[in-house]
Amino acid sequence: MDYLFDINNVSSGSFGTDCARCPAFSIGAKSYKEPFLVKTGTSTKKLLIVGSRVSKMAHMSGMPVMAEYLEPILNLLPSVYTVYYIPSITCYTERDLTHEQVIVGAKCCGQNIIDAVKQVKPDYVLLFDSPAIAAIYDKRTDKGCNAELWRGNRIPDQTLGCFVIPLFRYITPRQGADNTQWLLIQEDLKLVDPNLAFPSFTIKVDTTDAILQKLTAGDTIAFDYETTGLKPDNSGHRIYSASIYRLGDDTAYSFLVTKANCERLKAILSSREIKKIAHNIKMEERWTRKMFGIGVNGWIWDTCLGAHCINSTRGNSGLKFQVLVNFGRDDYSKSVEQYLHAETSNGVNAIHNCPIDSLLEYGAWDSYYCGLLYLKQYEILSSRVNSIGL
């Protein structure tokens, strides 16, 4: 008999804990959690497609997906890849599920999908639509799984050790796919590059202000402040620490702002010959004017605005999300975020209680990734020829 899973009627350990809340799960349901080989390539390179839920026709054939359904996609992929497939919900069900329920089911199946990645060890993972994106990233970000937010990125996922490409929902052309949607899917599949080496992003962190004596005319820096609140207008606020990454260096610097280094820092900020980048520059500009009595000269780029220009979907422009989709690193603010939060925009936070080493390392990473993001955004935006990014 096919019935919904009732956690009270099943012994502990019989199923994964997430099965209890999965709208697609039934005791005795057929599971398709083993990666399914759909195409053998001409080399050792591998690719895993995470698709939608299992269709009735595929299930009747004993497979998670029909080969002809994937054919248009396979024809667009380089022939060197051996291609595997797994549905974002690994249990088959005939129940009518809303889109929201499908996403919940995919979140519940997240560990199955991650296990499949570990088993296949692919060079690339393709995530078709929001449920597949949720399966991988739901527990790693608070930005949701809207495909419009994620598509267009080739994520060098440092946790999974492979490139991840989120895409729109896959509907074959003969199913009546919207021309623009199919065009964007085709464009995004060009991000699968067999010749691209998987990158790592490492930097030395120096928690001194030595960089202040090294900067000269012609340098380009990304910089960031850690402050006692969001806005500087109320009394009692100060710039607690600053971080600087000079483009091309192997070291990012992060240091407490003190009377001893304040004048040199102000000289650098006011210099038009030292070019400057920040993420949401209005924050650094506002705090500089309020605390130092000067404006910042030499601005050349705001990576927050750059992110908006590349993808204006709500939720895209935050630095931590940009770091995830561009450099594959999960949010590194966990150890400090409780100290940086204030109850109101004018309130004072608890930054003074934050462990200094953790705070300075956090700031260094912010400036480093901001610098890398500038280089990538400049390359992307310089190559654009039309309004949809093609």
Which residues fall in each region the model found?
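A polyanion-binding, active-site-adjacent surface
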Residues: 1-194
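Conserved RNase H-like, two-metal-ion catalytic cores of nucleic-acid enzymes
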Residues: 47-49, 56-72, 195-325
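Hydrophobic residues within well-ordered, non-membrane alpha-helices that form the packing/core
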Residues: 74, 117, 189, 269, ...
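Catalytic palm active-site di-aspartate
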Residues: 88-90, 302, 366, 370
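Hydrophobic faces of stable alpha-helices that mediate helix-helix packing
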Residues: 189, 278-281, 285, 316, ...
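Mixed-charge, glycine-rich, non-catalytic linkers/tails in nucleic-acid processing enzymes
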Residues: 197-199, 294-297, 337-390
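Proline-centered turn/helix-capping motifs that create local helix->coil transitions or kinks
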Residues: 328-337
